[in-house]
Amino acid sequence: MRKKLTALVLSALPLAAVADVSLYGEIKAGVEGRNFQLQLTEPPSKSQPQVKVTKAKSRIRTKISDFGSFIGFKGSEDLGEGLKAVWQLEQDVSVAGGGATQWGNRESFVGLAGEFGTLRAGRVANQFDDASQAIDPWDSNNDVASQLGIFKRHDDMPVSVRYDSPDFSGFSGSVQFVPIQNSKSAYTPAHYTRQNNTDVFVPAVVGKPGSDVYYAGLNYKNGGFAGSYAFKYARHANVGRDAFELFLLGSTSDEAKGTDPLKNHQVHRLTGGYEEGGLNLALAAQLDLSENGDKAKTKNSTTEIAATASYRFGNAVPRISYAHGFDLIERGKKGENTSYDQIIAGVDYDFSKRTSAIVSGAWLKRNTGIGNYTQINAASVGLRHKF
């Protein structure tokens, strides 16, 4: 009998050792379709006395896509005297094949937590990413059109150290530091050039890291009301020659990554929200400021707003989002007709607490000058399971 009890205790030890580890994640995928429309207006010239307007559109492209599936592990250990060790490891996965090849490519860290707050090091989400959970709850493989990808281009999970304060009567704050060697490198994208009537391929050239990057945040929550302020500063921005390509095309565009880095890049975002019963409202405003690397230190700026509203009717949650970017200022001059507008509408239907059908449609119009624009129409239907 004693031998059986001993064996039972020994077999339970490994389970006790990992009892504080949680496995979680989301598997979500579906069918997406989208098409592009554009208009180009050419002013009169000697060879062309009339205004020339060219319109074009692509066919509808449909494919099965992963909508951002991931898996995560997290846990903690009591170190005594109110101190805990905390850790987390998250990884992108794809049910449509492909996906990330390195572990910990999502928020992954190790740290300490106690009455003083929480200190973490690793790939840690910044304050902008935290705030976007309320303003952009959409699931899609197309983050530029079917999510508020332009508005939330500063969301990131940089390799950094972050401190979060404890709650003081509803207020809390955070500071975050990204060392220069961990900041994203600017680079010249691969491209073709014409030499002696021959197309010559020029490979991508990776440059030096941009600079140290600093983040700060302030949060407030009282009942159904919540608000946050997010701040970013980089002495040398690493987005490349033209930050406004990020504004227009999104951070993954090669056109956004040239060789003329910006200086004194700072971003400010205010987000407010209200939740009551089945109603959820969120509103955000964002200001992006920078200087050019030229001797004149000319100024750039973009101003944007976004709003999201949803209401639960039984198992269904209809939702709508709107974002607007005002005409930008580049090198001290206002860009005429350089705004953008975006609308996303859809509904989630919960089959259970963990499994939902997700349906959405999106429209994005980017004005790229007087008489010029690019428009993206997108729609998706899929399934999401949380565990």
Curated annotation (Swiss-Prot):
It is found in: Cell outer membrane. It comes from the Bacteria. One of its GO terms (molecular function) is porin activity. It holds the Pfam family Porin_1. Disulfide bonds: none annotated. Residues 1-19 form the signal peptide. Keywords: Cell outer membrane, Ion transport, Membrane, Porin, Signal, Transmembrane, Transmembrane beta strand, Transport. Its main location: membrane. It is a multi-pass membrane protein. One of its GO terms (cellular component) is cell outer membrane. The keyword Signal applies. One of its GO terms (biological process) is monoatomic ion transmembrane transport. Serves as a slightly cation selective porin. Major antigen on the gonococcal cell surface and it may have pathogenic properties in addition to its porin activity. Belongs to the Gram-negative porin family. Homotrimer. This is Major outer membrane protein P.IA. It comes from Neisseria meningitidis serogroup C.
